[in-house]
Amino acid sequence: MKKNLKKISVLLVAGILLVCALVGCSSTNKTVTTDGSTSMNKVISALGEAFQADTGITVTYNATGSGAGIQAVLEGRCDIGLSSRNLKEEEVASGLEGTILAYDGIAIIVHPDNPVSDLDVNTIAKIYTGEITNWSEVGGNDAEIVLIGREAGSGTRDGFESITDTKDACKYRQELTSTGDVITTVASNPDAIGYASLASVKETVKALSVEGVMPSEGTIKDGSYVVQRPFVLVTKAGTKLSPSAEKFFQYMTSSEANEIISGAGVVPAN
């Protein structure tokens, strides 16, 4: 009797293992993990919700910043990394691959009560490097300019400093860890200036035109708004994604996703 029970138990375990192998018992089989750029919150959340509704596959998003997301892919801690800058040469050399999902404007933002409405790239650079320190020098109030930016490793910061040619030269008063924090800080200080993803900008701040061009989907698409950068999906070159992650990746980069990407305030790459 004991032998029969033991045999039945072994058969049951074997059967369970076989079912697991065929349909997948791990929760990760039905979950796609993404990690990285805080600026990509709106577009990834929208794409994830639509994908989950259609497939039943859960998409998680860990808003850690571009640099941390790239590192997470490299270390195998997530399926797809999210970066609001192109990969650097050394990152590509380490075995990573970038696929551009969309293009986003970096809005130069001030408090709504600030009378300044337009700056050129050269003036923005002079402000952030400390050559221009008072708003009165650019047609504003007689007040010290408070420089708000992102932390080192941020894709938004990398894009902003690359475009304005201010790498390692900015005199930040505060270096914040998310797009939302920059917007909130500028909204609460009449003398502050900051930069943030256009897709995340709210009515609590005022976006400036740059060289006479306001940031919008149209001006980003035609290139006339010059302060823009890519939203990049980061994966390991030569390494297969899980079936669920591959399905999500293919969905995001298909024309089917373009309407959702546009609805999130950014310009689809394809």
Where are these regions (language model features)?
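Bacterial N-terminal signal peptides that target proteins for export
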Residues: K2-L12
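Intrinsically disordered, low-complexity segments enriched in Ser/Pro/Gly/Ala and basic residues
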Residues: I8, C25-S26
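Alpha-helical transmembrane segments
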Residues: G15-V19
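C-terminal motif of bacterial Sec signal peptides marking the signal peptidase cleavage site
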Residues: C20-G24
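Exported/periplasmic ABC-transporter solute-binding proteins
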Residues: S26-N270
